[in-house]
């Protein structure tokens, strides 16, 4: 756990907790699950369900569609300099899909460990943003089109909760008329494990949430809306 000493005045100072614990919880929890599945380890239903708490925050928005919250899956992404390399590996794997091939998901897990969640891959990860997909184009989409201010709220029973504040960028090849690597990347990262369907990628715009602030809302003495130092 990292702390930063902030000088308040000539006579006193305070210690502020950094956002490191959020990323350990959100990224490492997902990583441990992926690595365990790749290793063929048994994971209880209870543990699997809890692991999704770091994957499925509420996306909060406000705009023409009113005040809204929607549960969406999120994922961390490679740094910009690693996007093309990672996407190329994902697409090669997706192109190999055969409905009769029972090894597709396992091979996808191996790629996720290699490029995202393995210990050697950590320096490749961009911890300034998270990505998601829009599958409905309803309230969230309408609001973020007009107002990019966004909050992502995470909760894991019974006590853990984190809040991210920032700006939501909508990335849509149908709007831009050009290749959008983040839209392809986020769709591919979803389909690298699940049954792929590249024909609907154009219908699924990407959200790129740029993190500006991190809060610990956990029901602990260090939580209850405590702002964490970010970046740290």
Predicted regions located by residue number:
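Binding-site signature for planar aromatic cofactors or substrates
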Residues: 2-232
């Amino acid at each position: 756990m990292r702390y930063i000493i902030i000088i308040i005045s000539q006579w006193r100072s305070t210690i502020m907790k950094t956002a490191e614990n959020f990323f350990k919880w959100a990224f490492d929890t997902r990583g441990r699950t992926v690595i365990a599945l790749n290793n063929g380890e048994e994971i209880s239903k209870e543990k699997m369900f809890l692991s999704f708490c770091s994957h499925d925050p509420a996306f909060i928005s406000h705009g023409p569609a009113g005040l809204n919250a929607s549960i969406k899956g999120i994922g961390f992404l490679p740094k910009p300099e690693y996007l093309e390399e990672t996407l190329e590996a994902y697409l090669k794997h997706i192109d190999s899909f055969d409905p009769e091939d029972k090894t597709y998901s396992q091979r996808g897990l191996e790629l996720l460990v290699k490029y995202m969640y393995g210990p050697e891959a950590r320096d490749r990860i961009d911890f300034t943003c998270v990505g998601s997909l829009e599958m409905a184009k309803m309230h969230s989409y309408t609001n973020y089109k007009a107002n990019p201010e966004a909050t992502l709220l995470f909760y894991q029973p019974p006590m853990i909760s984190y809040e991210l504040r920032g700006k939501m960028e909508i990335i849509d090849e149908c709007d831009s008329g050009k290749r959008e690597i983040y839209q392809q990347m986020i769709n591919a990262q979803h389909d690298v494990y699940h049954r792929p369907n590249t024909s609907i990628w154009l219908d699924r715009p990407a959200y790129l949430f740029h993190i500006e602030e991190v809060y610990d809302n956990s029901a602990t003495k260090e939580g209850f809306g405590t702002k964490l130092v970010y970046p740290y």
